[in-house]
């Protein structure tokens, strides 16, 4: 499955590849056109890999929160988990918990490397999901390459745990806040999968 909103990128790459291939054939394979056609094929393949959006079976539960993004945990502080998405990761983001989207705020900013602390001033999109345990903030942060944040959801939408809520093109970072009713279960350096990896579990003294 290809990620929603990626069609124009794939069409552009495939069209350029086809154009160079036709020109190369029509001109008896001029070296630079032949090279351009091969580069276009490689770019199209990269786009297909990058914009993939595999179906994942999500085990929905109020007993835990799941990762909103594929990637590596690069920081955990003040009950916030920061996940860096590399280029090879799936870049579709998912709701870590079921609830209602209370607020979506887009903020302009810079494009520093997303793994730097100064990236807090980067372009971002902040979701506030109101859950039965309080508000959960999911923040999509742009980086040096990722300069296009895509939103699939709207304010007042009800979302299920694991539902697709957006995407960041070409790698970046997603932060998620953890309510005090939960214990964080991941560590810095751990690899996580959106919709699959449990990142926090409900405390034993709470009912669900």
UniProtKB/Swiss-Prot annotation:
Residue pairs linked by disulfide bridges in the UniProt entry: none
Superkingdom as given in the UniProt entry: Archaea
Membrane topology of this protein: Peripheral membrane protein
Keyword list, A-Z: Cell membrane, Decarboxylase, Lipid biosynthesis, Lipid metabolism, Lyase, Membrane, Phospholipid biosynthesis, Phospholipid metabolism, Pyruvate, Zymogen
Chain coiled-coil ranges: none
Site residues by UniProt (Cleavage (non-hydrolytic)): 171-172
Similarity comment: Belongs to the phosphatidylserine decarboxylase family. PSD-A subfamily.
Protein name as catalogued: Putative archaetidylserine decarboxylase proenzyme
